[in-house]
């Protein structure tokens, strides 16, 4: 499963590849944000982190 990193997506933790401040892409970028498993700090403030979805994930 291949994961895409968009401009607003930040990886704060190696094990949690999807950290974001406010991202939802209803386009082909395939960045899905369906909840936070944790939060992390990144200079600008807190980011929501999840491992739920990667590019190509089906449903939901």
Curated annotation (Swiss-Prot):
It holds the Pfam family Toxin_cobra-type. The keyword Transmembrane helix does not apply. GO terms for cellular component: extracellular region. Expressed by the venom gland. One of its GO terms (molecular function) is toxin activity. It comes from the Eukaryota. This is Weak toxin CM-3. Belongs to the three-finger toxin family. Short-chain subfamily. Orphan group XX sub-subfamily. Disulfide bonds join 3-19, 12-36, 40-48, 49-54. SUPFAM superfamilies: Snake toxin-like. The keyword Disulfide bond applies. It is found in: Secreted. Keywords: Disulfide bond, Secreted, Toxin. InterPro entries: Snake_toxin-like_sf, Toxin_cobra-type.
